[in-house]
Regions:
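Bacterial N-terminal signal peptides that target proteins for export
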Residues: 1-12
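A broad helix-preferring feature
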Residues: 3, 18-19, 220
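Bacterial N-terminal signal peptides
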Residues: 10-22
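N-terminal hydrophobic targeting/anchoring segments and the immediately downstream early-domain regions
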Residues: 25-197, 253-425
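Divalent metal-binding pocket/active-site signature
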Residues: 168-242, 247-256
Length: 425
């Protein structure tokens, strides 16, 4: 979830025969420019996206993921997921730390409930998933596996017991911080703000949170965190970590992106960096233009939200998203190739075993690269990687195999740690 939620305020996959067919067959055969060979590879993969903010729409707009409305501008629906062979989605459980002061956990529960309700409403197309076995089961049943990740450690309200409860409710990763520094983890979003009390990374309690996540089998997510928090998390975690929705800082100099040294560290840790589709993290010109209009954009959002409050209306993410889209439309979208550039860079620096997809769908209003308008466009990534010489095996890893591997290892480490006595906390 990015500025398309105030990120700017802190300055934010038929047959084997087809896969190995001749180059002539690899020519484009559909309107989107995706070849039969690319479709065969894409459709044989378990495609996993590690970050989508669609629960905000479930809750604020009463959006139905089964919607077939052609006018819907959202990135994810069951039809769009099927069209893009999206096999598993980690739905982001993001609680705005400003508008939900005093009830972070309560709003977290509301968002979790919204995901369960969608799965209950569409049992033929979607199922809740809590493990790698569940993801593979959903794939065999041709259903979307719905997983959940908390975006921002403030949701646990500084309580290990709440963290455990969220795991019991199905949360399978947690981003240690969002764009706000919380009471135990520094964020990249406000690291330069002298008014914020920082901790030089993770506090002792923050390290305890990481270790408890390891014990539970909850993936540690280092997107959004300050650089020192990243290094503390890497040093503390006994299991592989992920960056659920981050890109390469060497290509786009944004604090939310990952440096090459960090990429190498994630590779050594066995983790995965899942590339964010937000244009500001993929294209330097877009990032710079975003920063240039940030003050005016934030003022417009503030004024609009205050107007709603004065009218006695409840302010929602969708209200802010409406204004954000208007401002993002002022900046030209970069070409689709910038997304592939970041995947390619991370693969070259960290290795093809350590890169995946973390779209930030439905959290980057109108600000994805040209040609990436919804989950239905995911096969274009496979075509682009094929065009750059990636093997079918490596493409399947990038599409989801790497995340599945990391999740399996997190589960293994959890079983090992749970054989040990539980400390009183």
């Amino acid at each position: 979830m990015e500025t398309l939620k105030r990120f700017l305020s802190p300055l934010l996959f038929v047959s084997a025969a087809l896969i190995f067919t001749s180059p002539a067959v690899a020519q484009s055969d559909d309107a989107s420019g995706v070849s039969a060979r690319a479709h065969a590879i894409h459709d044989s993969a378990i495609v996993i996206d590690t970050h989508a903010d669609t629960p905000q729409r479930f809750l604020d707009e009463n959006f139905d993921i089964g919607s077939t409305d052609p006018k819907d501008i959202g990135h994810i629906s069951l039809d769009k997921a099927r069209a893009g062979n999206l096999g598993a989605e980690f739905f982001s459980i993001w609680v705005d730390p400003e508008t939900n002061q005093g009830h972070f956990a309560k709003h977290t529960l509301d968002l979790i409930d919204s995901v369960y309700e969608q799965a209950a409403r569409h049992p033929d197309g979607m199922m809740m998933a809590f493990s790698t076995d569940d993801i593979e089961r959903a794939h065999k049943q041709k259903k979307l596996a719905a997983l959940m990740g908390i975006e921002g450690g403030h949701s646990i309200e500084n309580d290990i017991h709440v963290l455990r409860d969220f795991y019991r409710l199905g949360v399978r990763y947690m981003t240690l911080s969002w764009s706000n520094t919380n009471e135990w983890a520094d964020s990249s979003g406000d690291i330069d703000d002298p008014k914020i009390q920082h901790h030089n990374g993770l506090t002792d309690f923050g390290k305890q949170v990481v270790l408890e996540m390891n014990r539970l089998g909850m993936i540690v997510d280092i997107s959004h965190v300050a650089d020192k928090t990243f290094w503390d998390a890497i040093a503390t975690s006994k299991a592989p970590v992920i960056a659920s929705h981050s890109s390469a800082r060497a290509l786009t100099n944004a604090p939310r992106n990952i440096t090459d040294d960090m990429l190498r560290a994630v590779a050594k840790n066995g983790g995965v960096v899942d590339v964010n589709f937000f244009s500001g993290f993929l294209d330097q010109k877009y990032w710079d233009a975003s920063k240039a209009q940030a003050e005016a954009q934030n003022a417009a959002i503030h004024d609009y939200l205050e107007k709603l409050k004065a009218q006695g209306k409840q302010v929602t993410y969708s209200d802010e998203d409406r204004i954000t889209r208007q401002w993002m439309a002022k900046i030209p979208r970069p070409p689709f190739t910038v997304l592939i550039d970041h995947i390619d860079h991370i693969a070259k620096i960290a290795g093809t075993d350590h890169v995946g997809l973390g779209s930030d769908f439905d959290g980057v209003a109108g600000a994805t690269p040209q040609g990436m308008d919804s989950a239905a466009d995911l096969p274009k990534i496979t075509q682009a990687l094929l065009d750059r010489g990636y093997s079918s095996a490596d493409i399947r890893k990038i599409l989801g195999g790497n995340v599945l591997r990391v999740f399996k290892e997190v589960e293994r480490v959890s079983r090992e740690l749970q054989a040990q006595p539980v400390q009183n906390q």
